[in-house]
Amino acid sequence: MPNTKPVGVAFSDPELVSGTTITGATISGGTISSATSVSASDITTTGGLYLKTATVAATGSTQADAASISDGLTLVSAADATKGVKLPAAVAGRTVIIKNGANAVLKVWPATGDGINAITVDSNYVLAANTSSLLIAYDATTWYSVPLLAS
């Protein structure tokens, strides 16, 4: 990592390049940003923790044609007891919050090969009208809802 800014006889502000690993560093008063992810064994924040949000219209009636959703909070419209949404692929710890904003039940499908609660792999569960559910991936194929919804 080259030193790029001269300060007296020393240099400061080393330039970090792609692939650089920093171990045991403390960031003070700065920002860490990434287009993909930042990981650590523990993350403490003195400010807020913000989730991304989206609004999606429910579509289709099967896992194959349901509207895809992502991490964070998704407000779902257009549920009519036949339409649904599809979760992203399960990755341990992945968190999704779904708010059914419609006056009808919403089908919630896992990604292909995944399961939700104790139901059969690739089967949906039903989210009641105007309710919410927090879903957390336990491993690479299993989602659990909080509260645990009957399946």
What function would you assign to each model-found segment?
Residues 20, 36, 72, 91-94, ...:
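Surface-exposed loop/turn positions
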Residues 129-139:
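Extracellular disulfide-bonded cysteine-rich modules/repeats
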Residues 84, 124-126, 133:
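Well-ordered beta-strand positions in beta-sheet-rich domains
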Residues 113-123:
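Extracellular beta-sheet repeat scaffolds used for adhesion and glycan interaction
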Residues 4, 126-129, 149:
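Sequence/structural signature of small/polar-enriched beta-strand/turn repeats
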Residues 37, 79-81, 92, 119, ...:
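Residues that act as N-cap/strand-start positions at coil-to-secondary-structure junctions
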Residues 1-71, 103, 120-122:
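Intrinsic low-complexity, repeat-rich intrinsically disordered segments enriched
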Residues 42-112, 141-151:
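Exposed extracellular interaction/assembly regions and N-terminal maturation sites
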